[in-house]
Amino acid sequence: MANSYRDLIVWQRTVEMTLALYRLTEEFPKQEMFGLTSQLRRAGVSVASNIAEGWGRQSEGEYKHFLGMARGSNMEIQTQLLIASKLGFGDPEKLTLAEQLSHETGKMLVSLMKKIRSRLPFLFAVNCSLFAASQYSLGYIFDMR
């Protein structure tokens, strides 16, 4: 079990992907500095950051929400890489590597989201039971029967 978001293979893969995006976009035309270059870099950082932020949230529901945001940013990357490819931007090998890392990241995010989703009904039931028990206990303590 992971003790930190840094232990998650999906987070590690996302950092690797982001570095690949930075290396790829170094070769983009200078006029793309505030276009595809900026968009790809920001989306890569967003994927890794959302995984980390979700890890630090209070509930698994919030964590899943941030994983969904990470997945959305990863989809942006895939779209932007396709556009860059069609425009002939970047080294083809670096482009292929970034595409592969993005697809792997996407699969890993979906897998992690499914794992969390399968645990949510159980956690909800446990939380409801604890809430009901605490209400009964408070009623008894304060004679609120």
Can you name each region flagged by the protein language model?
Residues 1-53, 57-145:
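Short, C-terminally biased terminal segments at protein or domain edges
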